[in-house]
Amino acid sequence: MKSVRALIVDDSSVMRKIVERALRQAGIDLTQVFEAGNGAEALGVLQGNGVDLILCDINMPVMDGLEFVKQLSGVEQARGVPVVMITTEGSESHVVQALSCGARGYIRKPFTPDQVKEHVMPLLAANS
């Protein structure tokens, strides 16, 4: 599998590092990791950078993860890039809402590297 450029969007800098570590422990070859603290920051990051994978929280200030995913359709650099939500929101309605907004995966916090691998690897393989 090719090396991956990932964007991790979460309002917690600690959680962004935990997600990055989980990706690496899952065996994903990360060549570049971009970070953003909310959806608006993430849209700014995408304006100048192409990525292969986006992992995003739902509950964030300024612009939440669901609104961010909705707005991705208007960002050329994000077309076709798989988005996986990683969040504490675990209700069925949140999962359905995230998937209907355009997310391709949903992982509940807390999570293990194996769960990240299980959700992310098929998406990366399909996009390679």
Residue ranges of each PLM-predicted region?
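A Lys-centered signature of the CheY-like receiver
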Residues: D11, K109
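C-terminal output helix
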Residues: F111-M121
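Two-component/phosphorelay signaling modules centered on CheY-like receiver
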Residues: S13-F34
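Hydrophobic/aromatic residues positioned on beta-strands within the core alpha/beta folds
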Residues: V84-I86
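Acidic, metal-coordinating helix/loop segments flanking the phosphotransfer/catalytic sites
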Residues: E35-L53
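Receiver (REC) domain active-site loop signature in two-component systems and cognate sites
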Residues: M60
